[in-house]
Every structure is written in structure tokens, then in C-alpha cells.
């Protein structure tokens, strides 16, 4: 079973004191203010054989997301909707404590949060993925790979997922005596997306709340809370991690800060996606 770096990366006490002393001055190891996000870089169509893909770099954190579409049957309880299946893998090359094998509880948690943010925000219109109502629909496989764990991997996973979905090509569907089949030689459009969604994570270290914690900061944090937002700043997901607690005042302050950061992050995401 893999362990997250925030649980395993041991920071010497003297270094923790150094980091916190910087917080007292309103700055951080990398020169950021407490409310600053790390530089974001998105490379679209990175995996050429996927139907859509995006490589996201958030500081030293690197995440690759790719999509594959296939014709499938709808779920019984949603006969008039397509399917979205999200998987996240923490690759062994991303951090020394990550192990080969099936996804562990940390990867499963990441996948669930990303999935919930996409569904609850209705970023992807699943009703427009129907080929024949009740019989045939598109299933969107969204696979997310953490390539380098430099902290705040959840935000990076959400960004990579959204970018890959916007990059996804939809191919022509043809029907013959055997049913429906995909004609990979003809692209008919893109996935029916309504809007992007972003996640903003804020860590608490002692009495300080910091945006987009890096690996060292996660290693000394008491707890962390993540908020997912639509462009109209509707909250569509909240996730807490870490063993510590937050007061209601901390949560209110964290959400107010996250909301302001989300505005800038959504603008940057739209700019890099060209939407």
C-alpha cells in the first residue's frame, strides 16, 4: 500500500521552524505569498493515441490525464445518459513511497473527488452522449496519472481532467447489421462540455492558511480543505484531508480565500484551453 508524501516526508524541526517563520513574514520558501498559486502550465494533446489528453504542471507537481471513448450500454438507473468513469494512479516514479499495483485508498479518494466535482458541476453533459436511448451510449474513460508529486496533487488532477475532456475528439458513429461502430477516420466534434470546474486547496499550518501547498508545506500541515467551483463560483465539492481540525472561522476564511483564487484560476484555465 502506498503512503502519501504528506504522511511520509519527514521535515526536520529546524526546517519546519524556518518555514513557519517565513509564514509570519507573509512569504514562503519559493517566494510566494500565502495566497499565491504556483505557475500553471497545460500542454494539450500530449498523449497522441488518446482521444484527448493534457499534461499539467503545477510547480513541480506533474499530472497527465487522458480519455478514451467507447460505445457501451447505459447504466440501468440512467438509461438516457452516457457514462463517465474516472481512474487515478499514483505512479511509483512520482514519489519514493508509491508502490506498483492496483490503486490504493489515496488514489481512489482522488478519483472520487474529481468524479464528484465533474458530475455535481454538470461540467460534462452526459445526456448528449446518448447514441440510442436505453441501448447505446458513449462511455468516457478518464485516466489520470500522477507523474511527479510536488504537493497539492488534487488541484492538479482536476485541472488535468478538465483540460483532457476539453481536448477530447468525438468520432463518427456508423450502424451496420452488427450494430454501432466507431469510424476513427472522421471526427464529428468535441465532447459536450458546459463549463470548466476547478479545485482550490488550502492547508493549515499552525495558525496560518496557505493556498496550493507544496510538498514540504503538506508535510508539516495540520489539515487541508479543498473546494471545487464552477465559473459562477458555486461550490460543487468540499474535501478535507489530514488528521487536524479546522474551526468554523478557519473554514470561512479558507473558503473566502479559495473563492478569490478560483476566479483567477478559472481565467488562467480558460486562457490556456482557448475557451
Curated annotation (Swiss-Prot):
PANTHER family: EXOSOME COMPLEX COMPONENT RRP42, EXOSOME COMPLEX EXONUCLEASE RIBOSOMAL RNA PROCESSING PROTEIN. It comes from Saccharolobus islandicus (strain L.S.2.15 / Lassen #1) (Sulfolobus islandicus). This is Exosome complex component Rrp42. Keywords: Cytoplasm, Exosome. HAMAP family: Exosome_Rrp42 (MF_00622). InterPro entries: ExoRNase_PH_dom1, ExoRNase_PH_dom2, ExoRNase_PH_dom2_sf, Exosome_comp_Rrp42_subfam, PNPase/RNase_PH_dom_sf, Ribosomal_Su5_D2-typ_SF, Rrp42_archaea. Belongs to the RNase PH family. Rrp42 subfamily. GO terms for cellular component: cytoplasmic exosome (RNase complex). One of its GO terms (biological process) is rRNA catabolic process. It is found in: Cytoplasm. Its main location: cytoplasm. GO terms for molecular function: mRNA 3'-UTR AU-rich region binding. It comes from the Archaea. Non-catalytic component of the exosome, which is a complex involved in RNA degradation. Contributes to the structuring of the Rrp41 active site. Component of the archaeal exosome complex. Forms a hexameric ring-like arrangement composed of 3 Rrp41-Rrp42 heterodimers. The hexameric ring associates with a trimer of Rrp4 and/or Csl4 subunits.
Amino acid at each position: 500500500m502506498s503512503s502519501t508524501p504528506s504522511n511520509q516526508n519527514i521535515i526536520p524541526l529546524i526546517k519546519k521552524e524556518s518555514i513557519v517563520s517565513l509564514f509570519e513574514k507573509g512569504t514562503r520558501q519559493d517566494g510566494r505569498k500565502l495566497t499565491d498559486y504556483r505557475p500553471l502550465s497545460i500542454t494539450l494533446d500530449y498523449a497522441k493515441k488518446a482521444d484527448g489528453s493534457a499534461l499539467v504542471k503545477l510547480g513541480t507537481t506533474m499530472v497527465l490525464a487522458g480519455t478514451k471513448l467507447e460505445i457501451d450500454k447505459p447504466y440501468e438507473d440512467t438509461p438516457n445518459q452516457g457514462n463517465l468513469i474516472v481512474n487515478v494512479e499514483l505512479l511509483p516514479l512520482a514519489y519514493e513511497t508509491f508502490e506498483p499495483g492496483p490503486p490504493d485508498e489515496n488514489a481512489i479518494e482522488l478519483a472520487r473527488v474529481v468524479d464528484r466535482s465533474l458530475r455535481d458541476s454538470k461540467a460534462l453533459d452526459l445526456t448528449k452522449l446518448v447514441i440510442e436511448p436505453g441501448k447505446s451510449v458513449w462511455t468516457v474513460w478518464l485516466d489520470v496519472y500522477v507523474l511527479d508529486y510536488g504537493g497539492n496533487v488534487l488541484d492538479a488532477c482536476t485541472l488535468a481532467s478538465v483540460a483532457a475532456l476539453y481536448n477530447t475528439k468525438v468520432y463518427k458513429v456508423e450502424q451496420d447489421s452488427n450494430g454501432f461502430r466507431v469510424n476513427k477516420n472522421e471526427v464529428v466534434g468535441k465532447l459536450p462540455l458546459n463549463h470548466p470546474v476547478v479545485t482550490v486547496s488550502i492547508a493549515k499550518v499552525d495558525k496560518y492558511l496557505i493556498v496550493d501547498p507544496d510538498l514540504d508545506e503538506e508535510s508539516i500541515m495540520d489539515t487541508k480543505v479543498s473546494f471545487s467551483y464552477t465559473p459562477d463560483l458555486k461550490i460543487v465539492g468540499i474535501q478535507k484531508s489530514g488528521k487536524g481540525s479546522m474551526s468554523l472561522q478557519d473554514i470561512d476564511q479558507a473558503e473566502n480565500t479559495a473563492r478569490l483564487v478560483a476566479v483567477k484560476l478559472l481565467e488562467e484555465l480558460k486562457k490556456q484551453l482557448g475557451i
